[in-house]
């Protein structure tokens, strides 16, 4: 087992990374009250819920559960209310812990519920997908979608602890595994060319679910994110770099309808668009773009999206949270392994990059 810490002063917390982790031993120091609400979904609960429920009950905790439908399209206010209903129906108080057992959607919703319930209760993350292990479970971003934009309602709510168990990735569908690899590739492109070289050498093993390689990828990804979050928790500066590919990707997700494409699939094509625009600006070479596309394709991810009317695409981009004083800012590549956030780009070149990476 490997351990990382997100350094946030008094709110410092560990990320435990390994296979067949022992929840009873690892969770005991981080469950502060007697009451635990496990939030999961209909896919994950039959696989792992009893394991965590029994571990918590053996610690003497009162455990209740809230099981939600599975999918991004349920990340809305109606389903968030089901978590509040469950907490209120069992009479949980301000010393309770909300434990997220699932992927990014469950983590986002359970975390947001924990931030809101009685103005804030304890929160624990047990991410069961690669994407949530390397990205959404670390750093405290929580929230739900609105019909006009992704993640428009939310809060920063740091967990007490994160348990990333590689054994849980064995039950992950191929498509979900690839979606997680998109976020792993993102860390390499935005800040670590050595990691990109490692991914190029080991992508076949990652796709084949080699547990040691997956643990290394999760560790290196979380280390990057932990460092950035420690420096910029509320995304006032450097943390925005973690949105490489996301402005384009969120537009794709929003237009196609949440859940049609997985988040990681949209981010993958978004990173291709960002690389394409970076090349058009003269920052990176054609070879760099080709290298970006190749590693994304080797992860079984899309490098273009279905045709989306340009006005619709730009409309969704205008709702992006990185818009500042009416100006869209994008995360682009100065070189592979070095991203910048900038408003200094030619909008016509951006339009060309969007259109060039769509298919009929």
Swiss-Prot record:
Bound cofactor: record note: Binds 1 divalent metal cation per subunit. Can use either Co(2+) or Zn(2+).
Pathway: Metabolic intermediate biosynthesis; chorismate biosynthesis; chorismate from D-erythrose 4-phosphate and phosphoenolpyruvate: step 2/7
SUPFAM superfamilies, alphabetized: Dehydroquinate synthase-like
InterPro entries assigned to the protein according to its UniProt record, in alphabetical order: Dehydroquinate_synthase, DHQ_synth_AroB, DHQ_synth_fam, DHQS/DOIS_N, DHQS_C
Needed co-factor(s): Co(2+); Zn(2+); NAD(+)
Compartments reported by the entry: Cytoplasm
Signal peptide (residue range): none
A GO cellular component entry from the record: cytoplasm
Positions of NAD(+) binding: 70-75, 104-108, 128-129, 141, 150
Main location: cytoplasm
Cross-referenced Gene3D superfamilies: 3.40.50.1970, Dehydroquinate synthase-like - alpha domain (1.20.1090.10)
Listed GO biological process terms: amino acid biosynthetic process; aromatic amino acid family biosynthetic process; chorismate biosynthetic process
Binding residues annotated for Zn(2+), in chain numbering: 183, 246, 263
Reaction catalyzed: 7-phospho-2-dehydro-3-deoxy-D-arabino-heptonate = 3-dehydroquinate + phosphate
Pfam families in the cross-refs: DHQ_synthase, DHQS_C
One MF annotation (Gene Ontology) recorded for this entry: nucleotide binding
EC nos: 4.2.3.4
Main function: Catalyzes the conversion of 3-deoxy-D-arabino-heptulosonate 7-phosphate (DAHP) to dehydroquinate (DHQ).
Family to which the UniProt record says this protein belongs: Belongs to the sugar phosphate cyclases superfamily. Dehydroquinate synthase family.
Protein name from the UniProt record: 3-dehydroquinate synthase
UniProt gene name: aroB
């Amino acid at each position: 087992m490997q351990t990382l810490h997100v350094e946030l002063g008094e709110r410092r917390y560990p990320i435990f990374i390994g296979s067949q982790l022992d929840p009873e031993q690892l969770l005991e120091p981080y469950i502060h009250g007697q009451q635990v609400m496990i939030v999961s979904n209909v896919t994950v609960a039959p696989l792992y819920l009893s394991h965590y429920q029994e571990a918590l009950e053996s610690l003497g905790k009162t455990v209740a559960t809230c099981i939600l439908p599975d999918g991004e399209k349920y990340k809305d206010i109606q389903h968030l209310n089901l978590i509040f209903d469950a907490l209120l129906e069992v009479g949980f108080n301000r010393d309770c812990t909300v434990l997220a057992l699932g992927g990014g959607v469950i983590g986002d919703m359970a975390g947001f519920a924990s931030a809101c319930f009685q103005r804030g209760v304890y929160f624990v993350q047990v991410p069961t997908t690669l994407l949530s292990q390397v990205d959404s479970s670390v750093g405290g971003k929580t929230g739900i979608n609105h019909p006009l934009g992704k993640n428009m309602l939310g809060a920063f709510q740091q967990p007490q602890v994160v348990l990333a168990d590689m054994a849980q990735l064995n039950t992950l569908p191929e498509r979900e595994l690839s979606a997680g690899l998109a976020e792993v590739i993102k860390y390499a492109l935005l800040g670590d060319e050595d990691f990109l070289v490692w991914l190029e050498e080991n992508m076949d093993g990652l796709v084949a679910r080699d547990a040691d390689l997956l643990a290394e990828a999760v560790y290196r990804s979380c280390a990057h994110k932990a460092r950035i979050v420690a420096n910029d928790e509320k995304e006032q500066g450097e943390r925005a770099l973690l949105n490489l590919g996301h402005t384009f990707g969120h537009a794709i997700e929003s237009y196609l309808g949440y859940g049609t494409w997985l988040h990681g699939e949209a981010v993958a094509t978004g990173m291709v668009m960002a690389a394409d625009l970076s090349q058009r600006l003269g920052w990176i070479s054609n070879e760099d773009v080709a290298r970006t596309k190749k590693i994304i394709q080797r992860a079984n991810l899309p490098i273009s999206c279905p045709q989306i009317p340009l006005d619709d695409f730009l409309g969704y981009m205008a709702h992006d949270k990185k818009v500042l004083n009416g100006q869209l800012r994008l995360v682009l590549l100065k070189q592979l392994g070095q991203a910048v956030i900038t408003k200094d780009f030619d909008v016509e070149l951006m339009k060309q990059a969007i259109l060039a990476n769509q298919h009929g």
